[in-house]
Amino acid sequence: MSININSEVALTYLIAKKKQTLVASLGVTFGISMYIFMNSLISGTNEYFEKMTLSATPHIRLYRDHQISNSDRLNHFLGKASTNLISNPKMVNSDERIDDPYTLLQALKTNPASLAVSPQITATIICSNGSLQENGNVSGVNILEQDKMFDITSTMIAGTVKDLSTDPNGIIIGSGMAENLSLKTGDNITLTTSKGSTKVLHVSGIFRTTIKNVDQTKCYANLSVVQQLLKKDRSYITDIYVNLKDYTKANRIGKQFELVTGYRVETWQSANEQSIAARMIRDMIANSVVITILIVAGFGIYNILNMMIYEKIKEIAILKATGFAGRHVVAIFIFQALFIGLLGSFTGILLGWLLSKTGSMIYIGKGNLEYLPVSFYAKHYIQGALFGIITSFFAGYVPALRASHVDPVEIIRG
C-alpha cells in the first residue's frame, strides 16, 4: 500500500473537518507559544537576578573562619593515655588575617581557572560631614581589580574608579550616602571606627546600584587607607575574592582552594542559597503550567480524532474491506495527528516569538531594570516544537489503534 494513498486519505479527512482541525491546531499553537514565552521570561528573569547577584558577590571568597576551642592540642601532647574533654567550649579569639596573603594572591592569580583576584578588608564605620552622620562600611580594595570583578564603572554617576586608584586618600561612596550627608565629588568625609580611629578622606566618586541599602552604606577606599584606619600593618588582609572564567564551576574549584589553602571558602552559590531556591521554584511553576497546557492540547487532539473515527467508521470499514491493513489505518490517523502537531508547532513558534518580543518591550523602569527581562534561545523554540509534535503523536496513537481494530464485516452488516 503506497504511503501516498495513506497521506491522501488523511488529508481528505482533515480537509473535511476543517473546524476541528483548526481547533486542534490552535490548542497546540497556544501550548507551544506559552511554553516558549514562559521559558523565555523565566530564563531572562533568572539571568537578570543572577547578574545582580554576581555584581555584588564574588564567585569564591577565602577567609579565616572562627574556631571553637577543642582538645586537639591536649590530645597531641598527652597522647592516648588520657581522655581529654573541654567543658563549655567557646569561640577562640584569633586574628582574622590571612597569613602571607600576597604569596597566596599571586598563586591564585596564576591559577588557570582564575579570571580576577582581589584582596579586601571591611570595616564598620560612622561617616560624617559636619553634624551629619551615617552608619556604613568601607571596603579596602585594589579598586581596579574590584572593578574588573564587579564592573563598578557601570554604576558610577560621578568620578571614576581610576580617580580612586591614583588618589591615596580618596573614597568612593554610594549615592544614598552622598545625598544623606550632602556630599559631592571633591568634598571631605570623616570616617570613624568603633575604636575611635578617625581618618579624613575626600570623595573621588559616587556610585548608584539602585539597591537602597548598598547605596546608603557601602564605600570603597584603597587597601592601605583601611589598614591605617584599623591601625594594622600592610600585610593585614582578611578576605580574598576570586572570580572564575566559568562561574558555574565555583563549588568544585572552591573545594580545591579550601583543601590547598586551609582557609574557609564561600562560593556564590552557598552565599545565595535562597536566590537559587527561588529560581528552582520559578522553573518548576513555569514548567508545570506549560506542560499542563500542552497535555490539555493533546486531549483536544485525542477527542477530535476519536470523534472523527466515530463519524468515519463506515469509511474505515470500507477501506479495510478494499485492502487497507490495520497498519495503514494507524498510519492515516498518525499522519493526521502529526499534521496537526506540525501546523500547531509552526504557528506556535511564530506566536511564541511574537509574545516574547512584545514582552521584552514592556517598560518596567524600576531600579536598573528598564524592560521586562526576556531571553531568546533557540533551544526553547526547538524544545517547544518537539514537545508539541510528541504530544500530538501520542494523542493520535490511541485513536489510531482503535481504528485499526475495526472489523469491516461487522460494521458493514450493522
Which positions does each model-derived feature cover?
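Transmembrane alpha-helical interface segments in multi-pass membrane proteins
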Residues: 306-308, 314-360, 383, 387, ...
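C-terminal membrane-exit region of the final transmembrane helix in multipass inner-membrane proteins
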Residues: 11, 377-414
